[in-house]
Every structure is written in C-alpha cells, then in structure tokens.
C-alpha cells in the first residue's frame, strides 16, 4: 500500500482520533476466543501478568518488545529468572542470552517449547485482529505454533480502527523505528517511512494476521490504557 500521510492517519498515529471503548473491545476479544483484560496503567498490567497470568509457569519465552520494557515486565522477568528457589521462572530471551555470552539461538529454540510466551503485538484492530511483522519469524512463530499459553501486552497506541490504518502505521512508523533501534541499515530507517525495499536488510520479511484465537492455545490479551512501544 502506498504511503499516505493525510490528516486522519496523522490523528490516528497520535491517538487523538477517538475515545477507546475498552468494554466493547474486551467483549470482541472474548467472542473470538481470547481472554481479554483491561489495565488502567503499567503497574496494573505488571501485577496482572506476574501474579496471575504467570502463576504456575516455570519457563517462558519472550519476544523483543519495547512495551514490556516500558511497563516494567521485562525487569520483573529478569528478577524471576535470577531466583534460585522452586518459584523461579526460567527466561528464554535472546537479549538475556547475549548478555550472558550464551548462544541466542538456544533461547529462540527453547522459547518455542516453554510453558508460556510473552510479547506485544505490532498492531491490533478494534475488530480483534492482530497484525505482526517479523524479520526472523521467532516471535510470530511462537505466537501461533509455540507455547500453549501466549500473553500479549498491548498499549492503546497499537489499537486501530481497521486493518488499513494498522498496516499503514506498521509500515511507516513501527518498522522504521524498530530498525533505528536495531541495525539501522534498512531503507525505511533511513527514509523514515516504507519504501518497499527488496534486499537483505529488509526487516519485514514475514507478516502474520491472527483473526481468531487458535482452539488449542490460551491467548491472554492485556490492554493497557497507556502508550507503550511503537
């Protein structure tokens, strides 16, 4: 889709286009087979995830996520991984493994068979569709064919009225920012928008669209009334 910077899209990106009907959104998620939760802020989301959704979980895979860092869940997971008692939750994260001098590929593989997987989503629509772009595929793979319990933490800035506006934001805001925080070598990082590049530095190699919860998996969608990630 060609880049479109009209006024309506700018408003949507700034989150100024509407008041969110969270009750309706949670009901839509429930109808589609998801477990939906509304949290007023990051502190409430962190408490819900760490004290309730991860109860009984002993291992967890984690996808790269600015949202998890910003709401404090990343630090809480590191603390759990560092424990030495029976309550420890072993964390499989490439960031953690790299910092420890371990092979990050092992974290990717173990994350696919962990008790749970946690990340954010690149975008979701008010109709309950989740859209994700990946360069390697570990995150989208784990979300649809990995652990039986999947937890997505979603800030209000990632919720869009429809697929078209979500896709426009992904290609022209999310991907360039992700690349800038990574290698910065992609064409979109340099241009600040999608230029539909076709080379080895392209970061949006894989796109997944999840229209409904898979019947053999638990999806826990934590909606936070704050802007998290991009």
Question: Residue spans of the language-model regions?
Answer:
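Short, Lys/Arg-enriched N-terminal segments with co-localized hydrophobic residues
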Residues: 3-19
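Short, functional N-terminal and low-complexity linear motifs
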Residues: 12-17, 42-43, 132-135
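N-terminal active-site beta-alpha-beta segment that forms phosphate/nucleotide-binding
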Residues: 21-108, 113-118
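N-proximal short alpha-helices
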Residues: 18-22, 139
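Exposed boundary/loop context
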Residues: 2-8, 121, 130
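N-terminal start-of-chain detector that recognizes signal peptides
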Residues: 9-10, 31-34, 88-92, 103-105, ...
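Conserved phosphate- and dinucleotide-binding cores of soluble alpha/beta proteins
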Residues: 111-230
């Amino acid at each position: 889709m060609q880049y479109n910077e009209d006024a309506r899209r700018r408003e949507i990106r700034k989150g100024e286009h509407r008041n969110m009907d969270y009750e309706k959104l949670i009901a839509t998620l429930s109808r589609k087979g998801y477990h939906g939760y509304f949290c007023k802020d990051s502190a409430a989301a962190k408490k819900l995830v760490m004290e309730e959704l991860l109860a009984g979980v002993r291992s967890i895979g984690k996808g790269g996520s600015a949202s998890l860092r910003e709401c404090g869940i990343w630090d809480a997971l590191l603390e759990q991984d560092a424990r030495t008692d029976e309550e420890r939750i072993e964390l499989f994260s490439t960031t953690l493994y790299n910092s420890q001098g371990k092979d990050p590929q092992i974290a990717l593989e173990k994350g696919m068979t962990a008790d749970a997987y946690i990340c954010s989503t690149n975008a979701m629509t008010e109709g309950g569709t989740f859209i994700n772009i990946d360069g390697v595929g570990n995150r989208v793979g784990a979300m649809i064919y990995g652990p039986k319990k999947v937890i997505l933490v979603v800030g209000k800035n990632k919720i869009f009225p429809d697929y078209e506006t979500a896709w426009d934001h992904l290609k022209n805001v999310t991907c360039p920012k992700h690349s800038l925080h990574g290698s910065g070598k992609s064409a979109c990082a340099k241009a600040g928008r999608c230029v539909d590049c076709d080379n080895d530095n392209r970061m949006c190699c894989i796109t997944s669209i999840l229209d409904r919860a898979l019947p053999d998996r638990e999806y826990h969608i934590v909606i936070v009334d704050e802007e998290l990630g991009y």
